[in-house]
Amino acid sequence: MSEKSAPPKVPVWRSPQGRAWIFQICMMTAFLYVAISAYRNALTNLAKRGISSGFGFLSNEAGFRIGEINSIPLPKGGVLWFLVSLIAGLAICKIISRYLKDKNNGPMDSRWFSVCLLISFGLPLLTLYLFRNDIEIVRYSESSSYTLALDTALINTLKVTFIGCVASTVLGLLVALGRLSPNWLLRNLCRWYVELNRNLPVLLQLFFWYFIVFQQLPNVRKSIDIGGWLILNKRGLYIPSLVPLSGAWLFCTAVLAAILGILVLLRRSKRMRNETGTPGKVFLPGLALLVVLPSLAWLITGTPFSLDFPVLKGFNYQGGTGLTPEFSALVVGLSVYVSAFNAEIIRSGIQSVAKGQREAARALAMKERQVMRVVILPQAMRVIVPPMTSEYLAIAKNSSLAVAIGYPDFVSVGGTILNQSGQAIEIVGIWMGVYLCISLLISGGMNWYNNKVRLVER
């Protein structure tokens, strides 16, 4: 019996895969050549003008004031163990989950879920408690470095982005449900809300909220005071703040343990519903955990927090927590603008669910609220999540418009540093790197959630 001869080898440059690799290598080489040439050219031109290059200027004294200052935790050596324990806890939980999934051909049960929660939260919390003295709280001042100024501005940007994403999602959901309402007045009001906000530039809306709304509030002496709990004037919104006492650590740990217990109960209830058709009890046991554990911590350590009320001293209020008009205008403007787009995305996702699903749920005597929460929205999420990623990214990028209304975000403070130091290339590079990281984090998180809610085919 004659042996079959092996097929002749195809040259690398003639196979599709080989040509693809060659093309990618050539393009990458050309890109690196252009980038290195541009970098050398920039260094030469900077040297001719007597401008130093590099990031050493970040340690220089800033010398300017930032209107929105946050307390920044400055980690020391021991905090590295916190990061190690966090990564180790997540890795252990992932290994346990993968092992049980392969062994049982299904998700883990409630007991192993509790163990994973305990490991993933317990290890970092224990490490943080052991090295609690290795964290120094610092606040920016005019004598601080450029690095601390950028850190403060970055926190301001992240704060606006997070609150804007949450607020625009909640507001968009409410408007979407209003657009689908059988009530003629509510439906048309929501429709005009969407049409108006989608077709007005976001910068114009920021100007409206800042100059027309928040700058027209009364002066400090004529503030709107609601029992000392809420004070509103031209300089901002003031509310009481919580001041942690000696028992705050145990109280917060008890609250976290109660939340983890509720998650375990929800997991157990879902498993019972899948196995028997009857969900387990969650409300009363969860309420008991949420009340009993923090109450015990309160009784053991005493009052965990005290209230610091804002008090008028001189020409402004001191104490409590204050929200500046710039911050309020930026958050409200971005939230209202993006909520119009989110409303249409959510509405299209709800309408993408087959009408038979709603009719079948009603045939089971489910209330309209249950139909929306249990049947419609879970199926609509796989349509809603992908386009919502773009809207969240838009909030992060549009937050750079804060410079127009005087809010000290990352771009605004970076521009001030650029004008003082003249390090344009370095500052622009920092801008690009930070916003790229923020976008990748948002995109990665939404892609992870999209994989969780996608339709699983058998």
Language model features with spans:
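Transmembrane alpha-helices and adjacent helix-loop boundaries
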Residues: 2-458
